[in-house]
Regions:
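N-terminal catalytic or cofactor-binding beta/alpha core of small enzyme domains
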Residues: 1-138, 149-158, 187-198
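Polyanion-binding loop/helix "lid" in catalytic or ligand-binding cores
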Residues: 141
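Active-site-adjacent mobile loop/cap segments within catalytic or ligand-binding domains
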Residues: 145-189
Length: 199
């Protein structure tokens, strides 16, 4: 019996993708006339626009992650280092524009929950130079990453959160390839939505 897939509930979890700085180029993931953004197998892309107001953007991203349909967040931005793409592995408890701790009661370091080793392997397989970096660059991306990680529930089903940094001079094609590689790696670890919540 043939079943029209368009009539079935979409059980793919959402993967939020955010280029946090609106001054960065917007790497367009809309590839055809449908107007729908590219989505990796097993997930559906939820684009979230960047904002120069980093605290407000962090609030919006945290709110998105609290939605039961959203299972992952990929932050995208620039690195201050020359050379390869960088997958940031941790964020420090640090204020955005001044010295001191952002959260007096929070952990000093928060580690990403995304599958870094697999993301790195997929970047390399796509022909892109890439490293996993333990240093937390002092910028809005690290601030937003810490905010999102520190707000995660202590649960086995916590969202997958990662941060991809591109070097200056990365081409639009390289950016699209990198985003697709890491998003696909993240999506492979996501669980389909329960039937009761699928739209």
């Amino acid at each position: 019996v043939d079943t029209d897939s368009r009539t079935r509930p979409d059980r793919r979890p959402a993967l939020a993708i955010c280029v946090w700085n609106p001054d960065y180029p917007t790497w367009d993931l809309v590839e055809d006339l449908s107007g729908e953004p590219w989505s990796p197998p097993g997930a559906r892309t939820q684009p979230i626009p960047g904002d120069t107001d980093s605290p407000a953007l962090a609030d919006r991203l945290i709110a998105a992650l609290k939605d039961q349909d959203c299972a992952a967040l990929l932050l995208i931005g620039r690195t201050s280092h020359p050379g390869p793409f960088r997958l940031q592995m941790r964020a420090e408890n640090r204020r955005l524009d001044s010295a001191g701790r952002l959260d007096e009661t929070g952990p000093g370091v928060a580690r990403v929950t995304a599958p870094i080793a697999e993301m790195l392997r997929d970047l390399t397989a796509a022909g892109l130079p890439a490293i996993a970096a333990s240093d937390a660059e002092e910028d809005a991306g690290s601030y937003i990453l810490y905010r999102a990680l520190a707000d995660l529930p202590d649960s086995l089903n916590s969202p997958s959160i990662g941060l991809l940094r591109a070097p200056d001079g990365a081409t639009e094609e390289a950016m699209r390839t990198a985003i697709k590689a890491v998003a696909s790696a993240m999506a492979r670890h996501l669980t389909p939505l329960p039937r009761s919540s699928a739209a």
